[in-house]
Design a protein with these regions (language model features):
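Glycine-rich phosphate-binding loops of nucleotide-dependent enzymes
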Residues: 2-259
């Protein structure tokens, strides 16, 4: 492959006291690709997100972003390095406008610091334009976010992360708690971001069907360790099902249910 990875993780270990949450995790994520990170509850995906996002410092290992070794100790450091994380709660205020949620503390101000006025027309224009780039045309950027569908709110959070500099986009179960139509909206948004070609996407999901639809690569975690990885073209449906089950064979699981 000619492309260089945007993020490289080698032998990442994270311990909480005597408990090892991540044990020697390695993976690479390339621009223009969706890298699905799959695992059951307790697999370590949430801990990995928090390490990459600067919430938890790693215990040992190496993380490179765009070829540079990093060691995040705060979320701001991760954000400044170009890592944008969209959590399940989205960090949106349902009662305020789409535009205010898009900027959320980074408003465009004209005039002296502390006395300036927000440039609402320009902020509305940017919000509408950035949402449109990844597939959502909003009629009124001043509508409350609470009037948007779940899929549209996900798109808003993704567009916001990209506009403010994310080159590595981490999506934490973006289709969970959504209806089927809204799930497809979100998957279409992710595909549009992928087609931009310059953003690496880490998709955390428990839904193997969604992963099969949009992922280019997979990494499977179980109990904090990588139990399998590969290109989507290399892994068949049975491989994915087996690795989603923690490496167990489907037949063995069926026998266990009969006991």
């Amino acid at each position: 492959m000619d492309k260089k990875p945007l993020i490289e993780i080698k032998n990442l270990v994270k311990k909480f006291g005597t408990f090892t949450a991540l044990n020697g995790v390695s993976l690479v994520v390339y621009p223009g690709e969706v890298h699905a990170l799959l695992g059951d509850n307790g697999a370590g995906t949430s801990t990995l997100i928090k390490v990459l996002s600067g919430v938890h410092p790693m215990t040992s290992g190496e993380i490179k972003v765009d070829g540079e070794i990093v060691n995040f100790t705060t979320p701001r450091q991760a954000s400044d390095a170009g890592i944008g994380t969209v959590y399940q709660d989205l960090a949106l205020n349902a009662l305020t406008s789409v535009t205010r949620n898009f900027f959320l503390g980074r408003e465009l101000i004209k005039g002296p610091s502390g006395f300036g006025l927000m440039q609402m027309d320009e902020m509305d224009r940017i919000t509408t334009e950035e949402m449109s780039k990844i597939g959502i045309n909003i009629a009124n950027p001043n509508q409350p976010v609470g009037t948007m569908s779940g899929g549209q709110r996900q798109t808003l959070a993704i567009a916001r992360a990209i506009y403010f500099g994310a080159k590595i986009l981490i999506l934490d179960e973006p289709t969970s708690a959504l209806g089927q139509k809204q799930q497809m909206e979100v998957l279409k948004t992710i595909k549009k971001v992928q087609r931009l070609g310059n953003i690496a996407i880490i998709l955390i999901t428990h839904n193997e069907i969604h992963a099969r639809l949009i992922a280019d690569r997979y990494t499977f975690l179980s109990l904090g360790e990588v139990i399998g990885s590969g290109l989507s073209s290399e892994l068949g449906n049975e491989d994915v099902k087996r690795l989603m089950a923690g490496g167990a064979k489907i037949g063995d699981l069926a026998k266990e249910l009969e006991q």
